[in-house]
Amino acid sequence: RIRCGAKIDNMVHIAHNCDVGEDVIIAAQTGLSGSTRVGRGAILMGQVGSAGHLRVGEGAFVGTRAGLHRDVPDGVRVWGSPQMEERAWHRSVAALSRLPGLLRRLRAVEKRLGLRRSRSEAEKEETE
């Protein structure tokens, strides 16, 4: 069911038994799995994907390319795949850019402490 005022962009898939509330905005290339309910005034940005039988709350915001695997409460902003609240997502994205430097520092500390393993030892340990 698609209710009054809903705006749906191109290449959006709305599966069986979905309920899209009033004044919802769904951007391009979004897919709603079966029995997903989207509350009034929610916004789903482009390339969002949802697992089935979920509820996106009223006034919720789902950022671009988010992968929904659980309900989104009313008024909450989520991003990412898997979904996380906006503040946590921003912190995660910022941390990713710092990983190469942190790995270099960790290797230097390991070397200084004599904890450095060879690559073959690490690979062997991972397969056990």
Question: What is the predicted role of each segment?
Answer:
Residues 84-127:
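Long, leucine- and charge-enriched amphipathic alpha-helices
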